[in-house]
Amino acid sequence: MAVKKYSPITPARRFMTSQDYSQLSKVEPEKSLLQSKSKNGGRNSYGRITVRHHGGGNRQKYRVIDFKRDKDGIKAKVATIEYDPNRTANIALLNYADGEKRYILAPVGLKVGDFVESGESSDIRTGNALPLANIPVGSMIHNIELKPGKGGQMVRAAGNAAQLMAKEGEYAQIRLPSGEVRMVRINCRATLGQIGNIEHENVKIGKAGRKRWMGVRPTVRGVVMNPVDHPHGGGEGKSPIGRPSPVTPWGKPTLGYKTRKKKKKSDKYIVKRRNQK
């Protein structure tokens, strides 16, 4: 989809861009695949803020997405390509031959009227889901499982794709969008192709109000708070943080501090780190 620019009739409009949604299907979402979402403003059951910067925003319904792609051997026709407010990628509504309807993540090149399927014997074509054992080395894939049958957990954001690098024994090696090379069991499923809506990264929000529509509240710097609110707070006038390095509101080191566990069990599946040359 193309990125739209606006005439600078206000300061916010000068740099604001949005996407041209004219290529999406002009239909209401499938009611049987909608679920209600309740907002909690980042509060827990005690009413205390547990996640900062959450609150407000437009009302949304959750679209139930088929990440498992476990309906094997039955072809499905793409009925619509739709906007999903809950994710950066667009979604496609599939009408299966037996009457069932499911949403999937829409890859690049998938159009209304196309047919997709899943299973070991599926064709090597964009939108089809197969075990990694049946996908040719070098293919671009997305919606990758970490455990067989659990459903895709990796590479699900707009414009993303991983590459199947090699197959050795029970594991396949996949290069993720971050550059990390990781081993995944060869009987895990993935979907062929690159996630659509690749222009999403070029959209500029442009104004604070648009972030509020998304349910994102303002972020305040710790150095302008009082000492009771943040370790960086306090002081007379414009003062430094008064520490050797920055910390979070709860006193933990931040900005470059490594937070991954030193001996995480899944480390053995990482062949190459994302920042390794």
From Swiss-Prot:
Where are the compositionally biased (Basic residues) regions?
A: 258-277
Which key words tag this protein in UniProt?
A: Ribonucleoprotein, Ribosomal protein, RNA-binding, rRNA-binding
Q: Which GO terms describe its cellular component?
A: large ribosomal subunit
| GO terms under biological process | cytoplasmic translation
* One Pfam family hit: Ribosomal_L2
Family matches, as Gene3D superfamilies = 2.30.30.30, Nucleic acid-binding proteins (2.40.50.140), Ribosomal protein L2, domain 3 (4.10.950.10)
Q: Where is this region: Disordered?
A: 20-54, 223-277
For this protein, the record's SUPFAM superfamilies field holds: Nucleic acid-binding proteins, Translation proteins SH3-like domain
Listed GO molecular functions? rRNA binding; structural constituent of ribosome; transferase activity
The Polar residues compositionally biased stretches are 33-43
Is RNA-binding found in the keyword set? Answer: yes
* Cited SMART domains: Ribosomal_L2, Ribosomal_L2_C
Q: What does this protein do?
A: One of the primary rRNA binding proteins. Required for association of the 30S and 50S subunits to form the 70S ribosome, for tRNA binding and peptide bond formation. It has been suggested to have peptidyltransferase activity; this is somewhat controversial. Makes several contacts with the 16S rRNA in the 70S ribosome.
User: What does the subunit section of this Swiss-Prot or TrEMBL entry state?
Assistant: Part of the 50S ribosomal subunit. Forms a bridge to the 30S subunit in the 70S ribosome.
NCBIfam families tied to this protein: rplB_bact
Q: Which family does it belong to?
A: Belongs to the universal ribosomal protein uL2 family.
**Protein name stated in the entry:** Large ribosomal subunit protein uL2
Organism (species) = Ruminiclostridium cellulolyticum (strain ATCC 35319 / DSM 5812 / JCM 6584 / H10) (Clostridium cellulolyticum)
